[in-house]
A protein has these predicted regions:
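N-terminal active-site segment of His-dependent metallophosphoesterases
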Residues: 1-81
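Extended active-site neighborhood of metal-dependent phosphoesterases/phosphodiesterases
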Residues: 84-150
């Protein structure tokens, strides 16, 4: 039997500042998240992009067949963060059996993120469901199969 190598990642919290995000977007719980990021967590995630690049090299070196990311690409779920995360994660999306993802709570941080569909716009291609009859809310939960079935 062949071995399938799976790389699972989560909680990369990529951000590159908040260019183009209106100040009014922070007059809610994002201001608390921004303060937490600025005063406590920013150093933890300071090299997140470089770590994702290293993960891509590791994935290729180890021959990962499938890459799964279970969310929290972002810190505050803004559209620029999600777009930036999609750009940085790109090298991981080419595994032979594919790349599969679901958003984390930080990716859907506030109602504006969900209503605007920012995560779906940037990552929707990786969340398709292959068994739609089991979905209960549109395409949720996304169900994917990989490899062979008995």
């Amino acid at each position: 039997m062949a071995v399938t190598k799976v790389l699972h990642i989560s909680d990369v919290h990529l951000e590159d500042g908040f260019p183009g995000v209106p100040l009014k977007s922070f007059i809610n719980k994002r201001i608390v998240g921004l303060a937490n990021l600025h005063f406590r967590r920013r150093t933890v995630f300071a090299e997140a992009a470089q770590k994702v690049e290293a993960l891509a090299a590791f994935s290729k070196e180890q021959g990962a067949d499938l890459v799964i990311c279970t969310g929290d690409y972002t810190a505050l779920g803004t559209e620029p963060e999600i777009a930036y995360a999609r750009k940085i994660i790109e090298p991981l999306t080419h595994a032979p059996l594919g790349f599969f993802t679901v958003p984390g709570n930080h990716d859907l941080y506030l109602r504006d993120t969900v209503e605007a569909g920012w995560f779906d716009q940037h990552f929707g291609a990786f969340m398709r469901t292959e068994i739609p009859e089991h979905a209960v809310d549109g395409v949720w939960p996304p169900i994917r199969g990989s490899g062979s079935s008995p």
